[in-house]
Amino acid sequence: MATSTTMSHQAIGSVVSQRPFKASQFLKEPLNNVPMKFRQKRFKIEATASQISVVDNTFLSPSPSKNKPHESKKKSNEAALILIRHGESLWNEKNLFTGCVDVPLTQKGVGEAIEAGKKISNIPVDLIFTSSLIRAQMTAMLAMTQHRRKKVPIILHNESVKAKTWSHVFSEETRKQSIPVIAAWQLNERMYGELQGLNKKETAERYGTQQVHEWRRSYEIPPPKGESLEMCAERAVAYFEDNIKPELASGNNVMIAAHGNSLRSIIMYLDDLTSQEVTTLDLSTGVPLLYIFKEGKFMKRGSPVGSTEAGVYAYTKRLAQYREKLDAAATI
């Protein structure tokens, strides 16, 4: 018999768009020429297709020969991964358990998203993954308004043939100036069950501080009819391995805008943390973290230790060159 949480996964998966094809198709595949095959895996049906790189080669590699305008470019042996917890939400402000309830950002949260965008404005972004919740999507969209490449983030709609057809971009040049955004429920916040909508302070007074602390901070203990951090990690990490890591391996620079618990789960995987270590990990709203994926390994290059870009990120040579080319382009 399915557990209540398993059933909630199925319910969420049935109503939330999965954007079920490789985002790398966005730039070059014509609408009627996308070969697909379907496979069932971990709560979802995923459509896969032949991969086409979306990496921004304008600043990352030399221009192709004028005599060979479609000459393929050598893929980079490293890729940037940016993690951003969404800005403050209206329920963060009210000190309510939010979980999978879909609430927007506060004005402060909007400002945090914009400031996050300023910090990553010199880091290449080819592809964005968000949860299916509006606070994460708002954070991603607002952050990208600050990026120096001025590419436009576009949420992919592939939940139906009509949705895909109606949202198709027919200009190849416009597609080149866009960034695909994939929303996935697997990156949603931990589902807090019967705590969702309750005031955190009042809940502690009702059930006891120790009990609420176990529900919130333990790895294996779920709140009533909700998810434990372990259950959240199972879906978030599986999605990361199946969908995001292959994009990084292809040289695509990825940003993930998600939530405290889904991002803690992913960081546990990236940093090889124990179940005890991850319970003490805190992520600030609207502060981007930077990793470099190179030769199959993740290297942490930034943590929230300063308010300026220089105080947050240790650039690799490749990222430094990217910024230099942005600076040079700005002077033309």
UniProtKB/Swiss-Prot annotation:
The record marks H259 as: Transition state stabilizer. It comes from the Eukaryota. The active site is at H86 (tele-phosphohistidine intermediate), E189 (proton donor/acceptor). GO terms for cellular component: chloroplast; plastid. The keyword Glycoprotein does not apply. Pathway: Carbohydrate degradation; glycolysis; pyruvate from D-glyceraldehyde 3-phosphate: step 3/5. Transmembrane segments: none annotated. CDD domains: HP_PGM_like. The keyword Plastid applies. Its EC number is 5.4.2.11. Residues 1-48 form a transit peptide. It is found in: Plastid, Chloroplast. Keywords: Chloroplast, Gluconeogenesis, Glycolysis, Isomerase, Plastid, Transit peptide. Its main location: plastid. GO terms for molecular function: phosphoglycerate mutase activity. Belongs to the phosphoglycerate mutase family. BPG-dependent PGAM subfamily. This is 2,3-bisphosphoglycerate-dependent phosphoglycerate mutase 2. It comes from Arabidopsis thaliana (Mouse-ear cress). The lineage of its organism: Eukaryota, Viridiplantae, Streptophyta, Embryophyta, Tracheophyta. The gene is gpmA2.
